[in-house]
Amino acid sequence: MMAEPWQALQLLLAILLTLMALPYQARKKTFLSVHEVMAVENYAKDSLQWITDQYNKESDDKYHFRIFRVLKVQRQVTDHLEYHLNVEMQWTTCQKPETTNCVPQERELHKQVNCFFSVFAVPWFEQYKILNKSCSSD
């Protein structure tokens, strides 16, 4: 006879916890803010370096690309950071894997791409993921 009140109490508690969790799940996906930020801001700077490294890893080009102009950086805050990055990248004189003293290629070897990246970022754990990438050549 005593088991029935405890079972009813456990069921009531489970329902209550479920009802409390639902608004949290809905709220978790809400944007807290979207702002344009400076490229020199720590986490934006880390994200820019990370996309440069990723772009070069995925590229079949023999020369390294480097960001030469940051056109726009937006930071979106939810339960993580998301950066929307518009950049101008150019081929450098450095062939892979060399990365020091790299300057832009000139004349016939000049190659430039304009790219937009959306990056999922949890920089305090050094976790990044490209959500969207779109690049076009000059």
UniProtKB/Swiss-Prot annotation:
Disulfide bonds join 94-102, 115-135. The gene is CST11. PANTHER family: CYSTATIN-11. Residues 1-26 form the signal peptide. It is found in: Secreted. GO terms for cellular component: cytoplasm; extracellular region; nucleus; sperm flagellum; sperm head. Has antibacterial activity against the Gram-negative bacteria E.coli. May play a role in sperm maturation and fertilization. SUPFAM superfamilies: Cystatin/monellin (SSF54403). Pfam families: Cystatin (PF00031). It comes from the Eukaryota. InterPro entries: CST11, Cystatin_dom, Cystatin_sf. It comes from Homo sapiens. This is Cystatin-11. Keywords: Antibiotic, Antimicrobial, Disulfide bond, Glycoprotein, Protease inhibitor, Secreted, Signal, Thiol protease inhibitor.
